């Protein structure tokens, strides 16, 4: 039997406005749902990364997101788990860069509500169609 790679997740949660927080996208609600998902998938949670009141317009302007990428590059996690893809990025260009970076570091992206899962062939195909 082959050794299965340990699944270590960084949970990424973000809200840009108070309205989003009130409409069911609060940081607490996102975190709770993603913790449940990680438990279901038997992922170890390395850390929860929170960007509050920050737009998805530019990935470089989000401190927690950048810390998560640094931790991924350092080999501390191999999955990034988010509630929806728009919590990660709204930019096609940023998504292209992110997917390439994830592939380079053998890391996968899972977005619970959008059925994004780059650890599967169908999931990678779906994300590539978006870019």
List each language-model region with its residue ranges:
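Short, structured surface patches at the beginning of a domain
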Residues: 1-131
